[in-house]
Every structure is written in C-alpha cells, then in structure tokens.
Curated annotation (Swiss-Prot):
Lineage: Bacteria, Pseudomonadati, Pseudomonadota, Gammaproteobacteria, Enterobacterales
Protein name as it appears in the record: Malate dehydrogenase
One GO BP annotation of this record: malate metabolic process
Listed PROSITE patterns: MDH (PS00068)
GO molecular function: L-malate dehydrogenase (NAD+) activity
Database matches in InterPro entries: L-lactate/malate_DH, Lactate/malate_DH_C, Lactate/malate_DH_N, Lactate_DH/Glyco_Ohase_4_C, Malate_DH_AS, Malate_DH_type1, Malate_DH_type1_bac, NAD(P)-bd_dom_sf
Entry keyword annotation includes Oxidoreductase: yes
Subunit structure, interactors included: Homodimer.
Similarity-based family: Belongs to the LDH/MDH superfamily. MDH type 1 family.
Coiled-coil boundaries: none
Keyword vocabulary terms for this entry: NAD, Oxidoreductase, Tricarboxylic acid cycle
Length: 312
C-alpha cells in the first residue's frame, strides 16, 4: 500500500506524515511531496523512526515522482486560515493549488483514492471532481473530502460535557465542512441525552471550533495537530478497507445521490475500491432537520463556486 501526502511540509502534512509513519501497516510506502525544498529532509527525519514503513520525500514544482504507484493520495497543500479569515477567504489561493495538484494526480495516479484536506473542503472537492472529469478519469467512489475533524471534535466536546471517554463515542456529522454546513447528529448518540440548550451550544461550538483554534494561536496558524490526527484516522480506515477489512465506516464528503446537494458529507461504507455505499443519515431531530434545510443554500453555493472555477 502506497500513500502519498501532498503538502507534507506544512503543519497538517507533517503531523499526518508522522502518524502514518507510526501507524501504517508494515511494508507500506509513505511518499511525501511539497513545493518547499525542506520536504526530502522531512522524509529523512521520519525515516529514522523504527517502523517498517518506507518514506521518501520530493520538493519542487513537480509532484509526479511522489505520485507514481500511489494507492491513496492525501492533499493538505495550501494556505492556512489567519484571524479574521473564514474558510471561504482561502478559496482564491487554494483553488489554484488544488487544480494544479489534481491535474498531476490525474496524469500520474489516476486510479488512486483521493482525500482532500485543503480548505474550503466544500469547494475544493467539486474543483477536484471537475478537473478529474475533464481528464476523463473521474471516479466518484474514489474522491473524498476529509471531514473527520468534525467527528473527532464532536466526540471530544460531548465527552467533556457528559464526562465520558471520547474514544468510546462516534458521532456522525453530515452536510459539509465549514460553518453552518457542519451538522453533528447529536440526537444519534446511544445512551446520551442532551437538552435543547446543550444541543444548540454544542452544535455552535463544533461549527466554530476551527475559529477557536485560529484565535487561540493568535496569528500563528490554524488547526494542524487535531487535523493531522483526523486525516490519519480517515486514511488508516481507508487503508484497512482497501486491504479487505469489512464494515469500515467513516463520515466523508462525497458526490451524493443529489437529494440534498451534489456533494454531501454522511456516513460511508468503505471497501477495496474506495466508497462502497453511502449510508443513511437516519432519523433527524426537529433541530437537525431545520439546521439541514437552512444550510443547503450555503452548501450548494460553495459547490457551484468550485464547479464554476473550472468550467467558466
């Protein structure tokens, strides 16, 4: 199994690469790419960690040496949020980066499963889909927006509030991956009941958790460590599924059946070829139903922005 990380010299990329070096199955290959010249050095640094995972690193404009033979490509390249920016402010810079990198993936490793971490995910995934489509290699079962950070934050915040071990929780989060489009299904936690006020406050905190980190870092960056952990969790689940484990389920942002929007985050059954089945979002509470209906216009606009970036 070969996993490539594009954007590997950044805060998320380095955290993700460290976790993959220590947790990928023995015999795996980890391939790191970043435009920054430090990237081969990051690979050398990681290579000293005693696990049976081979690491190589590539810098410069051309990502293709890192992509040859990749089974999974994780993309965290781009600029990070600073105070006062929201994820959509990142669009102007990051859209061009994703267009370029996905073009290289389409040429070099067209059959790889792709996980988009770069924000705004709501818009970057449609950009990736349109680039792959133009290249004639788009497979909707192999393109994922990584929304796992919303799930782990939900687990953490509910665990804190209810004095539970967050590792025992797995709260589904649907919709998208910014602001109001993030909808944690807090009515679906077995054995945990929350008041209306708790639900409203938790939902808001989960939706705004990224801003909480940006402000706490006081201009020094955005969420890199928790995002690295979230991306590693998603990637390792995908690796397990691709190697034949059954019943591997993670939430992710994928091309959907179109009931709510062209792309939608929901629980996914993963398998050897990527996405096997979009699972039901279950029965929503009245609060969740209202939140879902009121976010869809925002989500659809985010998606259209990405489509238009490539097609206009």
């Amino acid at each position: 199994m070969k996993v490539a990380v594009l954007g590997a010299a950044g805060g998320i990329g380095q955290a993700l690469a460290l976790l993959l070096k220590t947790q990928l199955p023995s015999g795996s290959e980890l391939s790191l790419y970043d435009i920054a010249p430090v990237t081969p050095g990051v690979a050398v640094d990681l290579s000293h960690i005693p696990t049976a995972v081979k690491v190589c690193g590539f810098g410069g404009e051309d990502a293709s040496p890192a992509l040859v033979g990749a089974d999974i490509v994780l993309i965290s390249a781009g600029v990070a949020r600073k105070p006062g920016m929201d994820r959509s402010d990142l669009f102007n810079v990051n859209a061009g980066i994703i267009r370029n990198l996905i073009g290289q993936v389409a040429r070099t490793s067209p059959n790889a499963c792709i996980g988009i971490i770069t924000n705004p995910v709501n818009t970057m995934v449609p950009i990736a889909a349109e680039v792959l489509k133009k290249a004639g290699v788009y497979n909707p079962n192999k393109l994922f927006g990584v929304t796992t950070l919303d799930i782990i934050r939900s687990n953490t915040f509910v665990g804190e509030l209810k004095h539970l071990d967050p590792a025992t929780l797995d709260i589904p989060v649907i919709g998208g991956h910014s602001g109001v489009t993030i909808l944690p299904l807090l009515s679906q936690i077995p054995g945990v009941s929350l008041s209306e006020r708790e639900v409203a406050e938790l939902t808001k905190r989960i939706q705004n958790a990224g801003t909480e980190v940006v402000e706490a870092k006081a201009g020094g960056g955005s969420a890199t460590l928790a995002m690295g952990q979230a991306a590693a969790r998603f990637a390792l689940s995908l690796v397990r599924a691709m190697q034949g484990d059954e019943n591997v389920v993670e939430c992710g942002y994928v091309e959907s059946d179109g009931e709510y929007a062209r792309f939608f985050a929901q629980p996914l059954l993963l398998g050897k070829a990527g996405l096997v089945q979009r699972l039901s979002i279950g029965t929503l509470s009245a609060f969740e139903q209202d939140a879902l209906e009121s976010m869809l216009e925002v989500l659809r606009k985010d998606i259209a922005l990405g489509e238009d970036f490539i097609n206009k």
